[in-house]
Every structure is written in structure tokens, then in C-alpha cells.
């Protein structure tokens, strides 16, 4: 029995053409999915980067805004007291070190004041914030370290007081302890040559 033209199946050539078209469509679809997945990952990475930068800026701004005139003595117990120390990252010691106020202690539940000593330092291209539970820390005083930024090559810091800038601040170097800068500016340079500038007014000014 012969089949009518409407009942005739696909020829081999037609089948091969259909498979070829299907392969092209599938490849295009896979490419679109991979592209979308890559774009989604890039977006997530960018969002993570922005959150990290925002958090680092928030810590620095909040700490500087809460800067206290309270002087501290070196952890060793030797040396003059000081209320603010600052240097560029290529110098010895922390980039910033000072006492901040406003550390909330609801109903005085913990055996501590609202003051804490904070330090910012650059180690192995990583910006680290260290906070102690007491302003006058000694060996064994509990402290909390937090990594704020990675991939940092250099940090420069400037201090503005009465319209004049200086690149270091030594709170025990012949200055009255009640004198604080009006503004602190940090220029953070990353290994990929990006730059982040953070300027913050200080607390405890007179």
C-alpha cells in the first residue's frame, strides 16, 4: 500500500538539517545561559565589593567621629600618654591609634566603660582594625580584630588643624593633650591602582 504525500516521513537530508538547526539553537541557548550566569556572578562580586568598601568607610568614619580626648599609656606601661597617633602606612606603628567613646553598654551589663582603644594598621596588604575592651590595654586585655580591606598597597593619612595639614600626629610629642585635629583624611591605594579617599570630622574637638 502506498502512503499519501501527507503521510510521508522525513527524509534523511531533512532530518540532518533539523538536527543541525537544533544544535545551533541549543548552542545559542547554552551561550546565553552561560553569559547570564557570568553576568550574575560579576554582579554579585561587585555587590560584595561595594558592601566591603561601605563597611570599611563606616568603621573609619564612626570611630573618627567618636574620637575622645582621653589619653592612654603605651601597653608596655612605659612612655608618655597620648590621645592620638597617626602615620602613613610606610612608617612604623599603626596608621591610626586613639580612644573612641560611645561604645554602648546597655544598663552597664558588662564590666567596662563606653570607651575603647582602636588601632588601624596595614599588614600584608590588609587593613586591620583592632579594638580593646579597655582604653588602657595591658598584656592579656581582650581585643577584637577585624579585616576591613584586602589588596591594599599603601595608605596615606593627613590631619587638618586650623587650616594647616600635617602628615603625622603624635599626641605625646609636645602637644597639649586636649588638642585634636579638625579632620582626618585617609587615601587608600589598592594593588590594582584604585584609590579610595575617606575624610571625616573628628569628635572631641575644642
Short names for language-model regions:
Residues 96-97, 146, 184:
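A broad, low-specificity signal marking well-ordered, structured residues that form hydrophobic/aromatic
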Residues 151-206:
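Short linear sequence signals and composition-biased patches located at protein termini or domain-edge surfaces
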Residues 1-36:
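N-terminal single-pass transmembrane signal-anchor helix
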Residues 127, 146-153:
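Local beta-strand/beta-hairpin segments that build beta-sheet-rich folds
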Residues 113-117, 142-143, 197:
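Short, surface-exposed coil-to-beta transition loops
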Residues 28-137:
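Extracytoplasmic beta-strand-rich oligomerization domains located immediately C-terminal to a leader/signal peptide
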Residues 134-147:
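Short aromatic-glycine motifs in intrinsically disordered, low-complexity regions
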Residues 111-113, 139-140, 150, 179-181:
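Short solvent-exposed loop/turn micro-motifs enriched in small/polar/acidic residues
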Amino acid at each position: 500500500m502506498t502512503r499519501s504525500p501527507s503521510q510521508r516521513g522525513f527524509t534523511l537530508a531533512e532530518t540532518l538539517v533539523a538536527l543541525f538547526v537544533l544544535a545551533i539553537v541549543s548552542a545559542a541557548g547554552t551561550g546565553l545561559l552561560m553569559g547570564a550566569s557570568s553576568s550574575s556572578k560579576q554582579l554579585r562580586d561587585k555587590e560584595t565589593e561595594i558592601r566591603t568598601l561601605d563597611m570599611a568607610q563606616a568603621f573609619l568614619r564612626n570611630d573618627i567621629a567618636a574620637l575622645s580626648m582621653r589619653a592612654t599609656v603605651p601597653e608596655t606601661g612605659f612612655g608618655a600618654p597620648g590621645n592620638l597617633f597617626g602615620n602613613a602606612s610606610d612608617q612604623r606603628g599603626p596608621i591610626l591609634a586613639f580612644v573612641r567613646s560611645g561604645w554602648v553598654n546597655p544598663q552597664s551589663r558588662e564590666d567596662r566603660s563606653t570607651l575603647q582603644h582602636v588601632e588601624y594598621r596595614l599588614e600584608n596588604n590588609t587593613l586591620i582594625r583592632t579594638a580593646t575592651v579597655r582604653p588602657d590595654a595591658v598584656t592579656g586585655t581582650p581585643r577584637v580584630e577585624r579585616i576591613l580591606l584586602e589588596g591594599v598597597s599603601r595608605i596615606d593619612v593627613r590631619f587638618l588643624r586650623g587650616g594647616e595639614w600635617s602628615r603625622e600626629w603624635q599626641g605625646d610629642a609636645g602637644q597639649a593633650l586636649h588638642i585634636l585635629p579638625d579632620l582626618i583624611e585617609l587615601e587608600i591605594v589598592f594593588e590594582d591602582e584604585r584609590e579610595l579617599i575617606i575624610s571625616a570630622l573628628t569628635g572631641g574637638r575644642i
